[in-house]
Amino acid sequence: MNFVEELRWRGMLQDIMPGTEELLNKEQVTAYLGIDPTADSLHIGHLCGVMILRHLQRCGHKPLALIGGATGMIGDPSGKSAERNLLNEETLRHNQACIKKQLAKFLDFESDVPNRAELVNNYDWMKEFSFLDFVREVGKHITVNYMMAKDSVKRRLNGEARDGLSFTEFTYQLLQGYDFLHLYETKGCKLQMGGSDQWGNITTGAELIRRTNGGEVFALTCPLITKADGGKFGKTESGNIWLDPRYTSPYKFYQFWLNVSDSDAERYIKIFTSIEKEEIEALVAEHQQAPHLRALQKRLAKEVTIMVHSEEDYNAAVDASNILFGNATSESLRKLDEDTLLAVFEGVPQFEISRDALAEGVKAVDLFVDNAAVFASKGEMRKLVQGGGVSLNKEKLEAFDQVITTADLLDGKYLLVQRGKKNYFLLIAK
């Protein structure tokens, strides 16, 4: 399996330094990619980089995932228009442990193979580095003219923000450059990879190695992932789509992928899964024959949800989706945990009802007309119930005056009323 060819057909290759492909074809290469540790979870904006490390290891090379502990304390101006919040060491260590756990789902850190993945943290070699040593050993090799020529620096100096660029952020490219030098000297690392906005920082590292060691190293970057409509990938109205279920439930994670556009699904299934080329081509052809069946989106959502979470979480997400969009049963509704239930019915009208009244028993007609405005009138409700068009917790309401009690509550708190095929209402007992 050819690593560069793999990235190329998947649409994961932007820039590549001359000689990189030849090196990868000639020997087992140690390569690294930096990961920002400013949160204790990765989000899907990190996934392209993580998949590059995964493909690298699958092709027989050795991946190093570099946690930017030292650089995370400073902030990188690349692609940013403002200063970053700085982190303390305790937070960084916690974030590192959480991120490694997530990376272990994609990379083999445990086996004894020569290309076993490693996690490194640049704080470990930067924390004892004095300013004087850094200036002497690193600073003298790179000119200010060279640093000023970088696009990321130019953008910040010439941008609309009037706060300019701090010295701290200006020196970021030297710190990242030193990471490459350190890994070259200690791990034999000859290749750095990253997002296309990192090209300037990566080439600074290659230049530093050339000037200090006379060594030749290489670089490649992946393109910025966008949406077909030009919007930012991985962002929703409620923020990032996280890999940690504490921040983004597996159901919401699954729904994100399921709801991407046709053109995005065709690109994303190459980037965010390990499905082989022939199978993807067959899926694309199948999808084009019947786009309304959303075969690409369903397979994409399945693969990524299982990879990030588990098959069990994927199955639960499908079941939860069927409750709103399919022929689900009362049993499948009752299996939902509270967070998923609320996520599934996030957009439906909600009403508060009295728990005390339910404890004594309330007629459905009083509850759904007087207490919660599910129906405009008792006449409308009677007609719909008689026609079999009203369900409570996915079971047909048998009678207009059926008595409802706390025993009917889902999770001891909720009632789900369905009026007709598509109108849902969530009643919350308080």
Swiss-Prot record:
Does the record bear Cytoplasm in its keywords?
yes
What keywords tag this UniProt record? Aminoacyl-tRNA synthetase, ATP-binding, Cytoplasm, Ligase, Nucleotide-binding, Protein biosynthesis, RNA-binding
Give residues annotated as binding ATP. 235
Which molecular-function annotations from GO does this UniProt entry contain?
ATP binding; RNA binding; tyrosine-tRNA ligase activity
Keyword set includes Iron? no
- List GO BP terms, alphabetically: tRNA aminoacylation; tyrosyl-tRNA aminoacylation
Q: Where in the cell is it found?
A: Cytoplasm
| Highest taxon above the source species | Bacteria
**Disulfide bridges in this chain:** none
The UniProt catalytic activity note for this protein reads: tRNA(Tyr) + L-tyrosine + ATP = L-tyrosyl-tRNA(Tyr) + AMP + diphosphate + H(+)
A single Gene Ontology CC term: cytosol
Q: Which residues are in the S4 RNA-binding domain?
A: 362-429
InterPro entries in the record, alphabetically?
Answer: aa-tRNA-synth_I_CS, aa-tRNA-synth_Ic, Rossmann-like_a/b/a_fold, S4_RNA-bd_sf, SYY-like_C, Tyr-tRNA-ligase, Tyr-tRNA-ligase_bac-type, Tyr-tRNA-ligase_bac_1
**Annotated positions binding L-tyrosine:** 32, 172, 176
NCBIfam families (alphabetical) = tyrS (TIGR00234)
Alphabetized HAMAP family for the sequence: Tyr_tRNA_synth_type1 (MF_02006)
**Name recorded for this polypeptide:** Tyrosine--tRNA ligase
Species of the source: Bacteroides thetaiotaomicron (strain ATCC 29148 / DSM 2079 / JCM 5827 / CCUG 10774 / NCTC 10582 / VPI-5482 / E50)
| Upper classification of the organism | Bacteria, Pseudomonadati, Bacteroidota, Bacteroidia, Bacteroidales
